[in-house]
Amino acid sequence: MKKALFIILIVTGILSACGDKTKVSSRETDTIALRPCPEFCEDTAFCYIEKQCSFGPRVTGSEAWRQCGDWICGEFERHGCLVEEQRGEVKMWDGTPLNARNITARYNPEEKRRVLLCAHWDSRPWADNDEDERNHHTPVPAANDGASGVAVMLEIARLLHEADSALSYGIDFVCFDAEDMGTPDWAEDGGGAETWCLGSQLWSQKMAGREDKPAYGILFDMVGGYGATFSMEEASVRYAKPLVDRLWKIAGQIGYGHYFPMRDGGGVVDDHLYVNRAGIPCIDIIPYHEYGRSVFGHTWHTLEDTPENIDRKVLKAVGQSVVQLLYNEKRK
């Protein structure tokens, strides 16, 4: 995905070069008491990625998208969730109307207190960051940038369904559509940031003003790439710093601190922005690569975004850290 990094990245780079005072947070000495929790299975999550990719690129409105969406709904239902869909018309960067499909799977649907876990499930229609310009109009396989976030959520839903004890609150797993339909690099003109995250914009418009909003949210975006580490994204810290601090600290305590370094990352246009604007504090687990063709990794918006380039260890680090956070909440 994503879109354009905010000017904060440029400012951070200037400050680092001029003063060698890059802002880095430190883990506090006091520890969080960790409660028992299930094991997140990275192999199962990887299989979920392979399955999504087996349908082909899930470009909004395509047959592969339809089939994969039906499969996602079926998997969440198999794991005991109540599945709901939101369909609505959105407009692409060039004004073309598009029928989007957001999928919500509710764990413990009867519980009033809820937590949001979310990811986008669509594929970018154009591999416009591929080194070969001949591929710039070809859809992206989207193993990492799309399937990985959904896979982590499906695995969490599975282990919650099979767990010996239930959580005392509900979880809304939301799969946002049309996140990656933003203006292609080869377009001569088009909109800006608002051309991205069309599904979450649609969803957030519905959520704004409601009293039954989730207490907080976590967005999974590109959570399976080789070499990925997850810095503290700027808008996440701005809207939900206590949640960022808690998750990063838990990750460090359970052995995944090298995947979740206590350092500031840049800002990014992503689904969590619209969730936050709807009044739900939401953070973004998104990679930050200091070196290479893209800060989002070398497969971003290329035809190399395939299951072969997924690192199960990264899936494990992200999934287990979030599961531990969820189980540290009060349980039945």
Feature annotation, model-predicted:
Residues 23-68, 79, 294-309:
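N-terminal capping segment at the start of a domain
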Residues 59-60, 89-91, 110-111, 121-125, ...:
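Solvent-exposed loop/turn segments at secondary-structure junctions
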